[in-house]
Amino acid sequence: GDVYKRQFVYFPGAFYGVGYNAGKEGYAQDLTTTMGAFRISYCTSLVGRFYIGVSGGIDYSGAKYKNSGMADRMNGIQADVESGKPVPGGKMGELYNLWQEGRYDPAKQDPFSNYIATTGDKPNAFNANVGLFAQYDTRDVTFNASKGIFIKAEAKWYPEWLGNTRRTFGRFTLTFDFYQKLWKGAVLACDLYADATTGTPSWHMYAKMGGMERMRGYYEGRYRDKKLVETQIELRQKIYRRHGIVGWIGGGQVWGTEKFRWGNTLCSFGCGYRFEFKNRMNIRLDYGWGNFGNQNLPWDRKRSSAFLFTASEAF
């Protein structure tokens, strides 16, 4: 059947750069982002529960940002210190001392500005695509399955002649979900997701780790690159009438602009509460944790974490 989706959001965000190392270093530049999206798809059953379809979509992302000027500020403090003035207190003094120790680099404090200057990408990016997909679905319930599998492979093409901001590029995604009842009230849910881009995408079209569904506990987009793979296992247990709890563990990788290395694997784990407000429809409250941040940066020393609240299961 036909599916239409449209979205428009205006929100504060952050950009850490592209690649695993950029995310690990923890330098972030604040953005005020305007995003709009429209997607349409049509599919038909080929055999039984196997479907094929076509899709199309338009994405727009605009970013407003300011440079921190940290390099000039550090140089200014250094000049004052050399003239006999004391190192200032507070955050600036701490960063100055870290800079002198080689543990802080003010030139990396504005990763979005650096990315735009280096790549020639535009802060306001328009992308349009056409695509094909195939899926196989034996789930008993789409939004809260207790048994069955879901497999979807989709290829999208973003040709330059459709008005794309960057050069022509392509994107392939693969989703594999498995659900199995265990004992009374218990379901084991497994998820595998892969995302690969060919060519040069716009800054907001890289595969992004984190968010509401996968690698919960990470800020979505802190780790982004041309290739991504994520997997998670979740145990869902109903405990009393409409109330339930869950626990999960997962792992993932981003690479592409940098080489794949097993040592760059990131972990995610957490727990959550479920309230069934309608039959097989849950309110979801999750708290997820990830890896620790850059211990050299005052704002990034804690373990990555996030509280999530929504009205559907993660997968």
Predicted regions and their residues:
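Short, small-residue-biased leader/transition segments that mark boundaries at the very start
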Residues: 1-4
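Outer-membrane beta-barrel translocator domains and adjoining extracellular loop/strand segments
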Residues: 6-13, 64-72, 145-147, 163-169, ...
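Residues that define the transmembrane beta-barrel architecture of outer-membrane proteins
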Residues: 32-38, 124-130, 147, 166-172, ...
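Structural signature of outer-membrane beta-barrel channels/translocons
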Residues: 41-47, 135-139, 177-182, 236-238, ...
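Repeated loop/turn-to-beta-strand initiation elements of outer-membrane beta-barrel proteins
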Residues: 48-52, 141-143, 183-188, 241-245, ...
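Transmembrane beta-strands of outer-membrane beta-barrel proteins
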Residues: 55-59, 68, 135, 152-156, ...
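C-terminal outer-membrane beta-barrel translocator/porin domains of Gram-negative envelope proteins
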Residues: 114, 120, 130-133, 139-239, ...
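Outer-membrane beta-barrel "beta-signal"
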Residues: 212, 273-276, 280-281, 285, ...
